[in-house]
């Protein structure tokens, strides 16, 4: 092994090898571009890819803040009265949540155009993150729809979510993470689906973005309709899932041995 390392060092320290470095970099660059062109099929393939990237960039903006309701539309949704106006209990297990994520998450729920919601927060944060509890308690004192409980110990994402469920009083249950944010019209659209389609399980598309700018999207996840084979292979539903409390009657809640994939297990 030492002999091989010695020979490698001799090659790297050779003046000719060092002098040819720029030429090798250029050659490798040309090879990589050639491979990329080959993978795209042709020059037309490259053009198509460039066009797709341009479309994707525009779509990211379109599905960002540009999709938020205008003042007029917000007022219209807030005044809407459905035949069924169920309370939606949103479960959020907390653990050492960064302050910026916490404020954005709670703020997005409070900014919903549909107002009959309940935010259930079970906090397993350690003493070094006491600000989580302080902030949540302050908001809960101002808004009775926010229900907060400090846990004696962190029970993991499944255990903490189960504690959230114990706090819930809504007819529908929503699964949410402490680093998520909701589109302002999300609950309105869900309740609309409940009324128009008698839905008891609802999910939506989602996007990953670079906080704090919602428009700086990294990926967009457009989900299919219910596809059992796909769902058996991967949890394409994920968040934001909302389902009728009746669907949980007689079933086991989240199991800690499936932490990380507890939503899929459920």
Residue ranges and their predicted role:
Residues 151-168:
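Glycine-rich, basic loop-to-helix element that forms the pyrophosphate-binding segment
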Residues 108-153:
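Acidic donor-binding segment of Leloir-type glycosyltransferases
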Residues 158, 166, 216-242:
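A recurrent flexible, glycine/aromatic-enriched loop bordering the glycosyltransferase active site
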Residues 173:
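Short aromatic/hydrophobic "clamp" motif used to bind/position activated sugar donors
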Residues 97-111:
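Short, well-formed alpha-helical segments that are part of the catalytic scaffolds
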Residues 1-72, 79-84:
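Boundary detector for helix-to-coil junctions that initiate low-complexity/charged tails
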Residues 259-266:
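Acidic donor-binding loop at a coil-to-helix junction in glycosyltransferase catalytic cores
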Residues 185-217:
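Conserved donor NDP-sugar-binding/catalytic core segment of glycosyltransferases
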């Amino acid at each position: 092994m030492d002999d091989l390392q010695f020979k490698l060092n001799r090659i790297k320290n050779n003046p000719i090898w060092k002098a040819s470095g720029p030429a090798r970099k250029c050659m490798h660059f040309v090879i990589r571009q050639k491979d990329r062109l080959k993978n795209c099929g042709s020059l037309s393939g490259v053009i198509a890819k460039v066009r797709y990237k341009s479309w994707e960039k525009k779509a990211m903006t379109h599905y960002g803040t540009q999709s938020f309701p205008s003042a007029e539309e917000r007022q219209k949704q807030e005044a809407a009265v459905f035949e069924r106006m169920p309370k939606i209990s949103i479960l959020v297990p907390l653990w050492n949540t960064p302050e910026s994520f916490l404020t954005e998450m709670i703020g997005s729920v409070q900014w919903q155009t549909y107002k009959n919601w309940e935010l259930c927060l079970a906090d397993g944060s350690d003493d070094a993150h006491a600000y989580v509890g302080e902030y949540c308690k302050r908001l809960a004192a101002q808004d009775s729809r926010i229900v907060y409980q400090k846990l004696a110990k962190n029970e993991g994402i499944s255990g903490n979510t189960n504690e959230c469920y114990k706090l819930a009083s809504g007819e529908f249950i929503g699964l949410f993470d402490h680093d998520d944010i909701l589109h302002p019209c999300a609950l309105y659209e869900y309740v609309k689906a409940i009324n128009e389609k008698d839905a008891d399980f609802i999910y939506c598309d989602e996007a990953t973005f670079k906080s704090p700018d919602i428009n700086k999207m990294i990926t967009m996840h457009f989900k299919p309709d219910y596809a059992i084979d796909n769902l058996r292979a991967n949890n394409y539903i994920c968040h934001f899932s909302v389902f009728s409390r009746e669907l949980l009657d007689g079933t086991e809640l989240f199991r800690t041995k499936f932490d990380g994939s507890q939503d899929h297990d459920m």
